[in-house]
């Protein structure tokens, strides 16, 4: 199995890095006692799950030889261990600690902040020497750090954005998870056709009814183009999910049809898309009760 060890200076961004790896699908453990690493790797190897563990000054062995022995033990068990070391300039670390008002782990030894930063560098030297990747976070944002990690681990700069396209009814309230909300209540309403009223936007007669209106087709086309314009930037911006909500009055006809059309379009483009119809689920539960 693949085991990523995130280590480095306190205040250099290990927690940010661990969250980024969690978004990439790694099983993440923060500050695991180092003697438990082989046991964790053995347990997770049965499910073929990759893992990431953060190690800092608090859970490192006192002897460099102990670290070497553990790494060799993992290698002998056919685990792929990769060490990523996060560094930052002394002035940057001092500023970050000043801004956060947190104590450095070595401050408990009655060291000043500058002395603690200096002492920590010596303790971490064995990990630095074994690191496959060293990143200085002094001048980069959290998004840039996450992107560098993706490039290193996955071989590509952008992770796959998961898109959720959902329909809803305004009378049930706005969906709390929506990033974008599009109101389609101004479009022709099949509800006023007695034959179409019991149907939904997934039924062919409703599809034919809405598909004949140019304003419906123009709305789908314009919304599709808008999303296609900005999707590349959203994919680069360290997002895991994008939720697009389409709403009409009851969430039964217009919003269902348009959400389905948009979702299927982006699926055909190779995007990872989930289509869901929130208010249809309410109608179904109501009718089956």
UniProtKB/Swiss-Prot annotation:
Q: Where does GTP bind?
A: 56-59
Sample GO molecular function, one term: ATP binding
* Family in the record: Belongs to the RapZ-like family.
What HAMAP family has UniProt attached to this entry? Answer: RapZ_like
State the UniProt keywords alphabetically: ATP-binding, GTP-binding, Nucleotide-binding
Q: Which Pfam families does this chain map to?
A: PapZ_C, RapZ-like_N
Q: Which SUPFAM superfamilies match?
A: P-loop containing nucleoside triphosphate hydrolases (SSF52540)
- Summarize where ATP binds, as residue positions: 8-15
For this protein, the record's NCBIfam families field holds:
PRK05416.1
Functional summary from the UniProt entry: Displays ATPase and GTPase activities.
Upper lineage is: Bacteria, Pseudomonadati, Pseudomonadota, Gammaproteobacteria, Pasteurellales
Which superkingdom heads the taxonomic lineage of this protein's source? Bacteria
Protein's UniProt name: Nucleotide-binding protein MS1718
